[in-house]
Design a protein with these regions (language model features):
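Bacterial Sec-dependent N-terminal signal peptides
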Residues: 1-24
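Exposed, flexible binding/inhibitory loops of compact, secreted disulfide-stabilized domains
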Residues: 16-141
Length: 141
């Protein structure tokens, strides 16, 4: 009986210690929201790096629980706005983010409906908000 209890306890201890340890390192970027509507009527990319600039993000219903005041000390935020489109099927997002010694390079991916593809006949204003977990200079391509 004691051997069975000891074997069970040993297996329990080994299985508990085998779990992965999280290094606590944040990813280079996080997509905070990607929406088909709600963006501006013109195409633009904006980098927010000051505390007063993120107040509008904190007031947004989709972002208020994702953006904290202290985030601006270690992060920048990027708004990617596709502009007004006459139909659905359009989106804007991040294809990749690369970090070099002195800057962060964001490659933007725009998606549009293909010729003849069925889409909704409603105006759309796609946008994406990205959190970059770095204070390096940001270059958008």
């Amino acid at each position: 009986m004691k051997k069975t209890a000891l074997a069970f306890l040993t297996i329990l201890m080994v299985s508990c210690s085998a779990s992965k340890s999280d290094s606590g390192k944040k990813p280079l970027y996080e997509i905070l929201t990607q929406q088909n509507n709600g963006g501006a009527s013109i195409r633009f990319f904006e980098i927010l790096s000051e505390a007063n600039e993120i107040k509008m993000l904190q007031g947004d219903e989709n972002l208020k629980n994702k953006v904290k005041s202290g985030d601006i000390k270690n992060s920048n935020f990027v708004i990617l706005n596709l502009g007004e489109k006459s139909s659905g099927g359009h989106s804007i997002g991040v294809e990749k983010v690369e970090e070099t010694a002195d800057k962060i390079i964001i490659t933007v991916k725009e998606t549009h409906p293909q010729e003849g593809e069925m889409t909704t006949s409603v105006m759309s204003n796609p946008y994406t908000v990205v959190k970059i977990n770095s204070k390096k200079e940001i270059v958008i391509q």
